Amino acid sequence: VECNKMNIHTSVIDPNKDSPCKNQCDNFVLGDLNNFDDIVKFGSKCDIITFEIEHINIDALVELENLGKEVYPKSKTLRIIQDKNLQKTFFIDNNIPTAPFKYFESIKDLLTSIDRDKLKFPFVWKQTKFGYDGFGVKVINSASDVEKLPDKPMIVEDYIPFEKELS
């Protein structure tokens, strides 16, 4: 709406044919945000590309950058945002305060760490990819909780009691 007031032409790609933005933009394209070809075809017609959600095909954004398109945030930044392990490592490398964490490739590796008393309950489990707004995040209080987790790469953080989360 604000872009319209400033005479800025907007295009939107969305997988939902009934997307709320459909009636607010100048050009609406129905497309898959994870499909390389959909994103490159869409982005090649734009001057500047930005996105509302982090779950988008990074390789397509790299291709668009290579074609000289302005992409914000940059694909390099998005790659870090999409992976909790890379994100936490970035925080540590840049002296940004964050909860202590460990990375595990599998549930087997996690259980081995618990069995060797290298990890104490409770802790916070986070899948490294495709988690957001509480999805892919669980407080783990016991080994029986671990058995219910999906077997995919993960980080576990020390449990830190808090009053409010800001994001």
What positions do the PLM features span?
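Active-site nucleotide/adenylate-binding loops and adjacent lid/helix of ATP-dependent enzymes
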Residues: I80-L166
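ATP-binding N-terminal substructure of ATP-dependent carboxylate-amine bond-forming enzymes
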Residues: V1-L86, K108
